[in-house]
Amino acid sequence: MALAHPPLPSLLSHNAQLRPVAIVTGSSQGIGLAIALRLADDGCDVVINDLPPKLRAMEDAVQCIVSKGARAVAVTADVSREDEVKRLVEAAVEKFGKLDIVRLSFSGC
């Protein structure tokens, strides 16, 4: 995927403890995926989130981010349900030790 803008230089990318951690909802495809990839390029570790039927695409997104040198994890959750949002945040903090950014990118009817 070609980026519209080149990646920003990151002084944090070599120290995992200093890297910002971002959750991007709806990030298995489309705009959400583009946001997640850009955050990884800019030095963030990323939690890929979408609904359970999109798990395979989420795992592909994680592999793409890891290939860029960032850390990533896929966590399924329905962000319309408060209990699942809490579980999503808890999973991010458990995996990376903190949470700095939440970017909502999902659609619904």
Language-model region placement:
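Short-chain dehydrogenase/reductase
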Residues: 2-97, 101-109
